[in-house]
């Protein structure tokens, strides 16, 4: 069985598919990467070249997978940074194909819209992202994205949980808040939270002063792997949080400007410190 991963790809660096594909393969998964955007490196470094993959090319690649019968063994679709609104239609078609071809196929939507109070996608992508979140089985927003998708204020732990419930009511059975520092989050830490039905968990992790590119992409991939393995949301939260934190810790030590994913790959299946989530509902 395979995972179709539809998101950005870099020539150098580890965000989007450049992070997710390797992580999933290292964890033993077959992955089919479909790039929405091809860039030389992360735009935050300046001078990035490349751009969105033409929609007709994405469509033809998807059709090629269909002709090979690929969706009869596609257990999950993972989507991230779209780069253009039209790519949302490709994702929607892929999800429909996977669900038709493989009963029980799962769709995880990482709704990449922005962070730290600002968008880094065009406004034309916001509405299609609402639609994708509504058809997802699992959605993994950061705090900013949760606020956008739910329309709720996300400033405290209780507000975050309420916003997750609002978003859940619009479609996705599982909502995972990938990073949150609220007014009541303990100092020098961050929260990762998950909601599955009425059950909720919170994982409090030591924070970092360094900003990382690709941390959310890595978390979403590892969470999907862990969830597929056990179908246990609380356990998947602990595994994904622990593995991602371990990689970030390895990256922060030398203050590297890209995730040291290759150097720390051994931490993905076996992080040195395992954090356990707290059941909060």
Task: Report each predicted region and the residues it spans.
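Generic secondary-structure signature for well-ordered alpha-helical cores
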Residues: 29, 63-71, 96, 100, ...
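Conserved N-terminal subdomain of the carbohydrate kinase-like
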Residues: 1-116, 263-278
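Buried hydrophobic packing segments
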Residues: 20-23, 220-227, 240, 244
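Conserved phosphate/ATP/ADP-binding segment of small-molecule kinases
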Residues: 120-200, 231-234
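Short, small-residue alpha-helix embedded
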Residues: 147-148, 210-237
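Short pre-catalytic strand/loop immediately N-terminal to key active-site residues, enriched for Gly-Thr
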Residues: 11, 200-213
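Charged C-terminal helix
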Residues: 234-281
């Amino acid at each position: 069985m395979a995972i179709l991963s539809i998101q950005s790809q870099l020539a150098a660096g580890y965000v989007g598919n450049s992070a997710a594909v390797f992580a999933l393969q290292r964890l033993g998964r077959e992955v089919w990467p479909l790039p929405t955007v091809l860039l030389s490196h992360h735009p935050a470094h300046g001078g990035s070249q490349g751009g969105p993959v033409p929609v007709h090319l994405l469509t033809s690649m998807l059709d090629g997978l269909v002709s090979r019968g690929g969706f009869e063994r596609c257990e999950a679709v993972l989507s991230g940074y779209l780069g253009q609104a039209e790519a949302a239609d490709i994702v929607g078609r892929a999800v429909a194909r996977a669900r038709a071809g493989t009963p029980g196929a799962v769709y995880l939507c990482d709704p990449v819209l922005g962070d730290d109070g600002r968008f880094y996608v065009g406004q034309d992508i916001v509405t299609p992202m609402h639609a994708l979140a509504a058809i997802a089985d699992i959605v993994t927003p950061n705090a900013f994205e949760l606020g956008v998708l739910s329309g709720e204020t996300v400033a405290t732990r209780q507000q975050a949980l309420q916003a997750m419930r609002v978003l859940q009511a619009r479609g996705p059975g599982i909502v995972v808040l990938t990073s949150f520092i609220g007014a009541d989050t303990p100092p020098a830490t961050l929260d990762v939270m998950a909601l599955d039905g009425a059950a909720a968990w919170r994982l409090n992790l030591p924070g970092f002063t360094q900003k990382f590119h690709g941390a959310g992409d890595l978390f979403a991939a590892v969470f999907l792997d862990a969830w597929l393995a056990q179908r246990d949301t609380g356990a998947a939260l602990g595994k994904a949080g622990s593995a991602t934190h371990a990689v970030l810790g390895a990256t922060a030590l030398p203050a590297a400007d890209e995730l040291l994913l290759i150097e720390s790959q051994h931490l993905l299946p076996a992080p040195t410190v395992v954090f356990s989530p707290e059941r909060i509902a």
